[in-house]
Amino acid sequence: MRRTLYRLMIELTNGRFTSYILRKFAQSRLSSIIIPSYAKVFQINQDEMEKGLKEYRTLHELFTRKLKEGKRSIDTDASSIVSPVDGVFADHGPIEDTKTFDIKGKRYSIVDMLGNEERATRYAGGTYMVIYLSPSHYHRIHSPLSGSVTERFVLGRKSYPVNAAGMEYGKEPLSKNYRSVTEISSDGEHMALVKVGAMFVNSIELLHERDTVQKGEEMAYFTFGSTVVLLFEKDMIEVVQELKSGQELRLGEKIATRLAHK
């Protein structure tokens, strides 16, 4: 019953008109009125922001803010996979040979997430990692490794919450929401960086257009908090053992080791 009521309420409020109004407000100068309250409620770390709070003219500018130079360091070990974002480590685990994985009691299909069987097949038997970005986090997304970009594509139309309630009661938000996917080949192995849109504010803006990417290089930004899913081929990585669900991660922090480089 809770799941049914939750989905009904989301469907009633999650329309194009609502999204349009919220997006327009966030991009308007009028939204600057609530910036101080927003920063206080979500406890935004103002010491790390590139500009002072009063210099942001709209909520959109605050959402997509940059950090001061030197506030994040990228792990330089050739064998390391780094966190592509500031966020909360949600979970990791194996991708079954059936091209599915389980998180928070819900089964997700890689075929659904990536849009077809061919893309999904290369990740069968591999590893997934999920990182959640709250409204307080830095919203820019960077590359977790160096390599060649093999494909960029967008799937889905609407987005549903990816917070705790959304993960429990929603309908596979990680594989059904609007999402932007970048696949990267590195030393003959593939990984997919899946950027999942948030409810109401779907926008994921791509900033990287070249065929190659360096570890830690900026690739995109969310216009609100959301989630990234990392998919790796079989025997490609070993997740850092100390990582725990609910742990805060910082951009550039080592989260896994490349097995081919050990």
UniProtKB/Swiss-Prot annotation:
Q: Posttranslational modification, per the record?
A: Is synthesized initially as an inactive proenzyme. Formation of the active enzyme involves a self-maturation process in which the active site pyruvoyl group is generated from an internal serine residue via an autocatalytic post-translational modification. Two non-identical subunits are generated from the proenzyme in this reaction, and the pyruvate is formed at the N-terminus of the alpha chain, which is derived from the carboxyl end of the proenzyme.
* Record-annotated disulphide pairs: none
Site (Cleavage (non-hydrolytic)): give the residues. Answer: G225, S226
Catalytic residue positions = D86 (charge relay system), H142 (charge relay system), S226 (charge relay system), S226 (schiff-base intermediate with substrate)
Q: Which residues, renumbered to this chain, carry the PTM Pyruvic acid (Ser)?
A: S226
Q: Which organism is it from?
A: Bacillus cereus (strain G9842)
The UniProt entry's sequence similarity note says: Belongs to the phosphatidylserine decarboxylase family. PSD-B subfamily. Prokaryotic type I sub-subfamily.
Name where it's found.
Cell membrane
GO molecular function annotations of the record: phosphatidylserine decarboxylase activity
Catalytic activity reported = a 1,2-diacyl-sn-glycero-3-phospho-L-serine + H(+) = a 1,2-diacyl-sn-glycero-3-phosphoethanolamine + CO2
Q: Which InterPro entries match?
A: PS_Dcarbxylase (IPR003817), PSD-B (IPR033177), PSD_type1_pro (IPR033178)
Asked if the keyword Lipid metabolism belongs to this entry, the reply reads: yes
Q: Per its record, how is this protein called by name?
A: Phosphatidylserine decarboxylase proenzyme
